[in-house]
């Protein structure tokens, strides 16, 4: 594991090359500049192509899961070619490479899912037999649970690609994260925002996570002002829930934690891909127990589902 290149005068941020990923990297750079009074040229953004960006014709669940979006970037971090990596936390596996950690989470944007409809503005108002595009197993399962009459088709690509396919009439509607659309200045395309009590989001959705090398004290000091307390606590719970269930792109898992003062509330769900079976769990407690609450919720929902719930489709 290499030492930080920032000692040579420039902090290097690694990111995917999509518009959304770059918007998140630029936000991180701006926050670092404001926190430390740094000039713009003190921080360099290095876009990288990942396997997940290159493979667009198959679901992630078939070709390696979430790690496809991070492997090349994390290798650059380990090698010292970059100092930090900026990620959408919902795309991050819970098990990270040795020597790396998600050290800071920025203040969370809206964690909810957005529906963008062509033949109806609201998801529940879609006509019977309508076609909805989504590549997320969680969203697919929730769609099938709520509207089993709707056809769900695999729908990959970046935000622009998905919206272009929608405009071309390939589907009647699609789902995207509210946070991503807002960060891209595209909130006006949203026709319906899904109630998280009915359509719960992915763990970590709406939060930007910054990955760094464990023990890199200079980077830790630089990042510390960017850490958002409530987001850090909520994600400790959500990612513990996900990790205890061995969550990946092959498992429809939802979870959202909210923080009020020193109290935390959590609601999680696991589903079968066809949406026919779903099990929900809730938890409440003090924020200092966030990770333990998430792990306990995972153990309880697994017990509810029974030992064979994940058999045959994980």
Curated annotation (Swiss-Prot):
GO terms for biological process: protoporphyrinogen IX biosynthetic process. GO terms for molecular function: hydroxymethylbilane synthase activity. Its EC number is 2.5.1.61. It comes from the Bacteria. Keywords: Porphyrin biosynthesis, Transferase. The modification S-(dipyrrolylmethanemethyl)cysteine is found at residue 249. The keyword Transferase applies. Its cofactor is dipyrromethane. One of its GO terms (cellular component) is cytoplasm. Pathway: Porphyrin-containing compound metabolism; protoporphyrin-IX biosynthesis; coproporphyrinogen-III from 5-aminolevulinate: step 2/4. Binds 1 dipyrromethane group covalently. It catalyses: 4 porphobilinogen + H2O = hydroxymethylbilane + 4 NH4(+). It holds the Pfam family Porphobil_deamC. Monomer. The porphobilinogen subunits are added to the dipyrromethane group. Belongs to the HMBS family. Tetrapolymerization of the monopyrrole PBG into the hydroxymethylbilane pre-uroporphyrinogen in several discrete steps. PANTHER family: PORPHOBILINOGEN DEAMINASE (PTHR11557:SF0). This is Porphobilinogen deaminase. It comes from Brucella abortus (strain 2308). The lineage of its organism: Bacteria, Pseudomonadati, Pseudomonadota, Alphaproteobacteria, Hyphomicrobiales.
């Amino acid at each position: 594991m290499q030492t930080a290149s920032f000692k040579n005068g420039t902090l290097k941020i690694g990111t995917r090359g999509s518009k959304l990923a770059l918007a998140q990297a630029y936000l991180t750079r701006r926050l670092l500049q404001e926190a430390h009074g740094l000039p713009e040229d003190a921080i360099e953004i290095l876009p990288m192509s990942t396997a997940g960006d290159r493979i667009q014709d198959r679901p992630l669940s078939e070709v390696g899961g979430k790690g496809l979006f991070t492997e090349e970037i994390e290798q650059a971090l380990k090698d010292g070619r970059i100092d930090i990596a900026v990620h959408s936390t919902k795309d991050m596996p819970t098990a990270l490479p040795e020597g790396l950690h998600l050290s800071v989470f920025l203040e969370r944007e809206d964690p909810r899912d957005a529906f963008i409809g062509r033949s109806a503005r609201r998801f529940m108002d879609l006509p019977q037999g309508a076609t909805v595009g989504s590549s997320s197993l969680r969203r697919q399962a929730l769609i099938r649970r709520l509207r089993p009459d709707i056809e769900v088709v695999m729908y990959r690509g970046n935000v622009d690609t998905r919206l272009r396919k929608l405009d071309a009439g390939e589907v009647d509607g699609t789902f995207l994260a509210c946070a991503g659309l807002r960060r891209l200045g595209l909130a006006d395309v949203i026709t319906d925002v899904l109630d998280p009590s009915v359509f719960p989001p992915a763990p970590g959705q709406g939060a930007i996570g910054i990955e760094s090398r464990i023990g890199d004290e200079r980077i830790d000091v630089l990042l510390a002002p960017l850490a958002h307390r409530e987001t850090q606590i909520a994600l400790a719970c959500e990612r513990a829930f996900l990790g205890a269930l061995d969550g990946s792109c092959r498992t429809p898992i939802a979870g959202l934690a909210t923080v009020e003062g020193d109290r935390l509330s959590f609601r999680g769900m696991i589903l079968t891909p066809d949406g026919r079976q779903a099990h929900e769990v809730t938890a409440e407690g003090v924020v200092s127990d966030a990770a333990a609450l998430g792990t306990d919720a995972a153990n309880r929902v697994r017990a509810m589902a029974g030992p064979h719930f994940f058999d045959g489709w994980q």
